[in-house]
């Protein structure tokens, strides 16, 4: 609040999906936010963009998972809903650890999905190295049982926000508290505080 009162532009930057981060944004009185791992931009409380994952990369990952009998779920919108054609993911690794609405439909055709925001694979750490399409998209492992593909470009989100604001990049000061914030730290561009 003191930074805002002093005339500074203040912005939350998170890897979380927009729908998840909104509560925190409002609770801590941020009008502006970079979310969805750098792919979402909220300006003055309004979601301006929320770019999905690269579709071709997503399709390759899901196809390989299906060929190898690996359960998958996909987030195709900005909500806690995940979609799949069966419950193979749940059979293999159990339910996800966060609030989730499962929409499982044998007629679900992932090739007809317009946008993918996250992909969850029932792929443990030992199998991960042999998954050929892993590098098609950024991935993170918060749970040992499954691998999650989601945007991971908070630094890119900072660039987008500054471009929208038409503000100099060297004015940026970032604060981070964990390894997932390292992407934002670039001493050659701006000031970072850990």
PLM regions: where:
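A generic structural motif
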Residues: 6-10, 169, 188-190
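Glycine-rich beta-to-alpha transition loops that act as phosphate-gripper elements at the mouths
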Residues: 14-15, 173-179, 193-194
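Short, intrinsically disordered, charge-balanced linker/junction segments flanking boundaries
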Residues: 1-2, 109, 191-194
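Short hydrophobic/aromatic-enriched beta-strand-loop microsegments
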Residues: 30-38, 94, 140-142, 191-194
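Conserved acidic, metal-coordinating active-site core of Asp-based
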Residues: 64, 68-187
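Active-site phosphate-binding/coordination module
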Residues: 1-89
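Structural motif
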Residues: 28, 187-188
């Amino acid at each position: 609040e003191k930074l805002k009162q002093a005339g500074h532009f203040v912005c939350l930057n998170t890897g979380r999906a927009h729908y998840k981060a909104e509560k925190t944004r409002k609770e801590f009185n941020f009008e502006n936010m970079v979310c969805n791992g750098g792919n979402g931009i909220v300006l003055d409380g309004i979601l301006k963009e929320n770019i999905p994952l690269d579709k071709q990369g997503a399709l390759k990952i899901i196809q390989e998972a299906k060929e190898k009998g690996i359960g998958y779920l996909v987030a195709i919108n900005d909500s806690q809903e995940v979609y799949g054609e069966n419950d193979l993911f749940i059979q293999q690794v159990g339910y996800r650890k966060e609030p989730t609405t499962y929409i499982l439909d044998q007629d679900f055709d992932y090739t007809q999905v317009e946008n993918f925001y996250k992909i969850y694979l029932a792929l443990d750490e030992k199998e991960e190295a042999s998954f050929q399409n892993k590098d098609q998209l950024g991935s993170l492992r918060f749970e040992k049982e499954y691998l999650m593909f989601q945007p991971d470009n908070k630094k890119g989100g900072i660039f987008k926000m500054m471009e929208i604001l038409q503000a100099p990049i060297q004015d940026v000061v970032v604060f981070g508290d964990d390894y997932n914030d390292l992407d934002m730290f670039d001493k050659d561009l701006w000031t970072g505080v850990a």
